[in-house]
Amino acid sequence: MPQNTLNIVILAAGKGTRMYSKMPKVLHRIGGKPMLGRVIDTAAALNPQNICVVIGHGKDQVLNAVKRDVVWVEQTEQLGTGHAVKTALPHLSAEGRTLVLYGDVPLIDVKTLKTLLEAAGNEVGLLTDVPADPTGLGRIIRDGNGSVTAIVEEKDADAAQKAVKEINTGILVLPNAKLENWLNSLSSNNAQGEYYLTDLIAKAVADGIKVHPVQVHTSYLAAGVNNKLQLAELERIFQTEQAQELLKAGVTLSDPARFDLRGRLKHGQDVVIDVNCIFEGEVEIGDNVEIGANCVIKNAKIGANSKIAPFSHLEDCEVGENNRIGPYARLRPQAKLAADVHIGNFVEIKNAAIGKGTKANHLTYIGDAEVGSKTNFGAGTIIANYDGVHKHKTVIGNEVRIGSNCVLVAPVTLGNKVTTGAGSAITRNVEDGKLALARARQTVIEGWVRPEKDKQ
């Protein structure tokens, strides 16, 4: 097997006590995706022979949440990072090298890892950092020539070693030919009673194998998450990076600090996004689209020249060109709007196709429906699509005028150019061009006297 064969081991067995959560630490999200999922994505981009994920605490939750084509290995006892990598040994190739990553270091990037792998060659690679505050972290110990000789955990460090600013990020490249022997020789004779993976550095030096340190160019790339404060800090860093990329690509963000992307955003030119908008999943926005403040848009496609007014929610839907949506509109899954459609305040659409130029400007529910072009819904129109057991379809033709406060009881079909009187409950099909009225005739009672309250 060639020496450049790459195995990747991701350590994800920890409990994460300081998260104060029933959820395993690696499932907490950055940018809408579990941290472990992000690390697996990065690992996969390196095209390794295999990816082995070591899990332990909450393993069933992890397996259910992160369904990926990797090798899952259970660490039944959490006895340290060295022990965790040892559990993965049966799944590693005899030759080549192994890159060790961490499920709670979500922002590590491909570029940094490629640099580390290139520097390590077939020897040992070590990713280091010089943070502003190294408290609690393992220190990099060098000899008089500047060569790395060991890593000392803070709990085991003396005063001189604690004064060292350069720290171990935990990310290592190790030669597989030596890995098993090194792991088998680890001792737990230390302050934490654990098998430290970091002790392999001293073993490599003792075997005459050079350790190649690479300092990460930005500290947050190798930052781990141990509590909700650190999670929030990395979330903001991640969102700031995404906002900056969009700004560089020509998107106008009214306030980059008040923008969240939890997926991917494909955009055209001259897109304007106001404050506090959240984008989730796969979102595509055409040219000259404006998104108002406080919108939530998930898995949606928005055509060119459309405007989404504030406080609108769009999910799993398609908006055609030159639409006007909102404010306070809700487009639910399988809503598909053609061009020039107007959907106004407090209008909800679900599993419905809306034809070109149709308008529903106020207080309307359209569900399980097919609507033609240039139709108008009066305020308060409701499509009653559910009979308590089954959903039923409503078909509405072109140039239909539906009066205010109408109920269309599905299944029902309204032909082209139908008009319904305000307040009607339409339960039967209406042919083209007809006027449908379905309400009680108004009665005025002459001589009626409104009763008065008894005087005390």
Curated annotation (Swiss-Prot):
One of its GO terms (biological process) is regulation of cell shape. Its EC number is 2.7.7.23, 2.3.1.157. Residues 1-228 are annotated as: Pyrophosphorylase. Keywords: Acyltransferase, Cell shape, Cell wall biogenesis/degradation, Cytoplasm, Magnesium, Metal-binding, Multifunctional enzyme, Nucleotidyltransferase, Peptidoglycan synthesis, Repeat, Transferase. Its main location: cytoplasm. It comes from the Bacteria. Binds 1 Mg(2+) ion per subunit. GO terms for molecular function: glucosamine-1-phosphate N-acetyltransferase activity; magnesium ion binding; UDP-N-acetylglucosamine diphosphorylase activity. Mg(2+) binds at residues 104, 226. Pathway: Nucleotide-sugar biosynthesis; UDP-N-acetyl-alpha-D-glucosamine biosynthesis; N-acetyl-alpha-D-glucosamine 1-phosphate from alpha-D-glucosamine 6-phosphate (route II): step 2/2; Nucleotide-sugar biosynthesis; UDP-N-acetyl-alpha-D-glucosamine biosynthesis; UDP-N-acetyl-alpha-D-glucosamine from N-acetyl-alpha-D-glucosamine 1-phosphate: step 1/1; Bacterial outer membrane biogenesis; LPS lipid A biosynthesis. Residues 229-249 are annotated as: Linker. UDP-N-acetyl-alpha-D-glucosamine binds at residues 11-14, 25, 75, 80-81, 102-104, 138, 153, 168, 226, 332, 350, 365, 376. It is an enzyme of class 2 (transferase). Disulfide bonds: none annotated. Acetyl-CoA binds at residues 379, 385-386, 404, 422, 439. It catalyses: alpha-D-glucosamine 1-phosphate + acetyl-CoA = N-acetyl-alpha-D-glucosamine 1-phosphate + CoA + H(+); N-acetyl-alpha-D-glucosamine 1-phosphate + UTP + H(+) = UDP-N-acetyl-alpha-D-glucosamine + diphosphate. Residues 250-456 are annotated as: N-acetyltransferase. NCBIfam families: glmU. In the N-terminal section; belongs to the N-acetylglucosamine-1-phosphate uridyltransferase family. Homotrimer. This is Bifunctional protein GlmU.
